[in-house]
């Protein structure tokens, strides 16, 4: 007979804990996202502190290929306020994304098509790791945006009519 048979096991899997730190809603409006992928990101200590405080802006960010790596460009992470200026980071520095070689090759082949680009979609905590969701998308034209707005309004009307 086991002594600990009446104890209930708690779910201690930290990988299931997600906390959204920054979201790029503008990219979802500007681009038709065809594929998404989760990537790690190489950060400095002060950048981690700033991101955990919600001081990251993904709106103008994009990804580029250099020397067989994917770099995250033009993402603003504010300097940490409690650190001296000597130890702080550059807010707009290029950050390396951590992906497998096969994923990098797949992303590169997808972006070689005309009009395709890689944009950051969201930044979140997965356990104790900061992860970035990037998407391959094609820029929407004005008529595509109008069509999406019409679809949203029609869907909203249908849902409100069904609730009555």
UniProtKB/Swiss-Prot annotation:
Xref: InterPro entries: SmpB, SsrA-bd_prot, SsrA-bd_prot_CS
Cytoplasm is among the record's keywords: yes
Molecular-function GO terms, alphabetical: RNA binding
Cellular localisation: Cytoplasm
Positions of region (Disordered): 141-164
Keywords assigned: Cytoplasm, RNA-binding
GO cellular component, as recorded: cytosol
Example GO BP: trans-translation
Role summary: Required for rescue of stalled ribosomes mediated by trans-translation. Binds to transfer-messenger RNA (tmRNA), required for stable association of tmRNA with ribosomes. tmRNA and SmpB together mimic tRNA shape, replacing the anticodon stem-loop with SmpB. tmRNA is encoded by the ssrA gene; the 2 termini fold to resemble tRNA(Ala) and it encodes a 'tag peptide', a short internal open reading frame. During trans-translation Ala-aminoacylated tmRNA acts like a tRNA, entering the A-site of stalled ribosomes, displacing the stalled mRNA.
HAMAP family per UniProt: SmpB
Family: Belongs to the SmpB family.
Name of this chain's protein: SsrA-binding protein
Species this chain originates from: Prochlorococcus marinus (strain AS9601)
